[in-house]
Amino acid sequence: MLRSELRDMVVAMVLWGILLPFCLSQTTSPSQDGKIKFRLAGYPRKHNEGRIEVFYNREWGTICDDDFTLANAHVLCRQLGFVEALSWSHSAKYGPGSGKIWLDNVICGGSENSIEKCVSRGWGNSDCTHQEDAGVICKDERLPGFAESNIIEMQVDEKRMEKIRLRPLKGAHAGRLPVTEGVVEVKFKEGWGHICNTGWTIKNSRVVCGMMGFPSQRSVGKKPNSLKSAYRIHSVTCSGNEAHLSACTMEFSRANSSAPCPGGGAAVVSCVPGLQFTQGRVRKAKLNPVPQMRLKGGARAGEGRVEVLKGSEWGTVCDDHWNLQSASVVCRELGFGTAKEALTGARMGQGMGPIYMNEVQCGGDEKSLWDCPHQSITAEDCKHTEDASVICNIPYMGFEKLMRLTGGRTRLEGRVELLLPAGGGVRDWGLICGDGWTSREAMVVCRQLGLGHASSGLRETWYWDSSNVTEMVMSGVKCKGDEMTLTDCQHHSVVSCKRAGAQFSAGVICSDMASDLVLNAPLVEQTVYIEDRPLHLLYCAAEENCLAKSAAQASWPYGHRRLLRFSSEIHNIGKADFRPRLGRHSWVWHECHRHYHSMDIFTYYDLLSLNGTKVADGHKASFCLEDTECHEGVSKRYECANFGEQGITVGCWDLYRHDIDCQWIDITDVSPGNYILQVIINPNFEVAESDFTNNAMRCNCKYDGHRVWLHKCHLGDSFSEEAEKEFEHYPGQLNNKIS
């Protein structure tokens, strides 16, 4: 009897477990009138992104972000007429909507042709608020045959400001960039208009200057002449903390009409540029005080993952409640304007190390992000997949007009040509010598042209269409990688190029995404040990130059070499896979170890004295770049077995165990003492990355002749500059940069 009751209870529980999801989730039923429309809303945003709004049963509403995924975004973007989704946003990133929340707990596979085919709680069944409205970011590429009017019913408001600009005042500096002072002009559907300055305040100017890329404003010294203008906007009132003028209160005239501006004229602002956008900007940037904030992983100036300095170590910020006000505080602190976008979900790549801040809620007038209310982090609060990022407004400098790419197959690639003075006030185009050209120089070119990250830096461009430009005008270019223009980099004062001819001029290939490799520093510290390895086991290692030079004079096969061994775990935390520069047809077969080398040098291992002298070294040719393990939800793509493709997928890592050949430094000739262990990934910048400053790792090393200890292992850019100098006690290579 008891067994029968137990069986019935189990059956009931199983049925309840099966039926419950069907009670809560159902395929979204069609609209009663069959007319479902979609649009993107919110502000500020681009035309291919925004809060997703659905027109159902004659009423516009939103979609809740509960259970929202990229698969949902793919379906919605296709219904909006775009080919696919790039990302999605939660927590009303584009502002809260109004009216109904039509859909909640939507779960799509990604291949559905309509959101109606996805599972959800049903139309109008939601427990969300508009603070949970979902948004999408679609790839800016239209589906063939999709008429714009069919899929996006844009709610174009007469009052919407499409663009804002400063028209320079007449005077000595009218043609100088950036434009820091001028008449505020606003673009509407029907053209440009002015703002009546009656009641205009310095707080209003602060908002406009922020949009123009300037951190602060000043009083206007000169008033413009009387303008016969269309004053579409009147009575503007800002608090000064808005990220966009559209967030201020104001009065509008009707379209195609204007109202007079009694006793006033056009609004004029005067802005103060950040140090990096002033005359002599390179020299002044070097004199800047030690920063407490930085941006990492971005392709362009003024964008990147937000990192803050606490004590002597850099850490990231969690994206909970991250918004434009908080992002604008970061941007102004760094000498930019207000934030154009406050990005969540590690859109600029994941950081490493500590996460210092969570639930940051700035008012907008704080001098530093540390001044804003925020929560400390516990282990359960955040992961680096939630690192906050920003895209700041920066002043227009016209840098892209001084450079162009020619001969390439797309606008993202080509031979680099510079516009430089040619004498007599004439400017002419010229080429750059390809000698010594690397992906770091390509990074600067792609940044200057606004084309994203560098994919490749090319020393020969003979395979691209030739142009009538043949003269070399720059050579010996050596960049750190973070410069805004190529002329900011070191270069020869007099052109000197070993290989003449346009076919040996520098070229680049740019890309929206880039990889970013970092070493797991704690693992190096945990796995280090010393091995006395017999010479008869080291023939292959000797063939591949993995031993010190003194090994050539050893009594082979007798004796041994003393090896400092450790594991290297190399993570790709960027936004694109790390691939060898050369295709598999160019890989070199090494018979002794029975494997292919896809890169000549992938990693340097160095043991340095405290004065910076190299006392022992090693290297690791990338005989097998593959995905050893990946984070949850990420699939392996690269495997070396059977001459497979080599690389490291985003979110995966390649592990070189301590017990494999050449995973060591030969310290047979090293005396006991204190040293620095240094590991540098991708040391020759052979493959482009979004950030080279985190490619170096250092540890304090103590060797007593029998045992070895490592401590304070850290990435080269994880400490403040002062702490790093104290650590190394010597000048030289810092953060894998030239110093």
Curated annotation (Swiss-Prot):
Return one GO MF term: fibronectin binding
- Note one Pfam family from the annotation: SRCR
Q: Which reaction does it catalyse?
A: L-lysyl-[protein] + O2 + H2O = (S)-2-amino-6-oxohexanoyl-[protein] + H2O2 + NH4(+); N(6)-acetyl-L-lysyl-[protein] + O2 + H2O = acetamide + (S)-2-amino-6-oxohexanoyl-[protein] + H2O2
Entry-linked InterPro entries: LOX-like_protein, Lysyl_oxidase, Lysyl_oxidase_CS, SRCR, SRCR-like_dom_sf
SMART domains under this entry? Answer: SR
Which E.C. number(s) belong to this protein? 1.4.3.-, 1.4.3.13
List, separated by semicolons, the cofactors it needs. Cu cation; lysine tyrosylquinone residue
- Pinpoint the SRCR domain residues: 38-139, 166-272, 293-393, 403-511
Cofactor comment text: Contains 1 lysine tyrosylquinone.
Record keywords, A-Z: Copper, Cytoplasm, Disulfide bond, Glycoprotein, LTQ, Metal-binding, Nucleus, Oxidoreductase, Repeat, Secreted, Signal, TPQ
EC class (word): oxidoreductase
Q: Which residues, renumbered to this chain, are glycosylated?
A: 256, 468, 611
Which residues belong to the signal peptide in this entry?
1-25
Q: Is Hydrolase found in the keyword set?
A: no
Q: What is this protein called?
A: Lysyl oxidase homolog 3A
Q: Which gene encodes it?
A: loxl3a
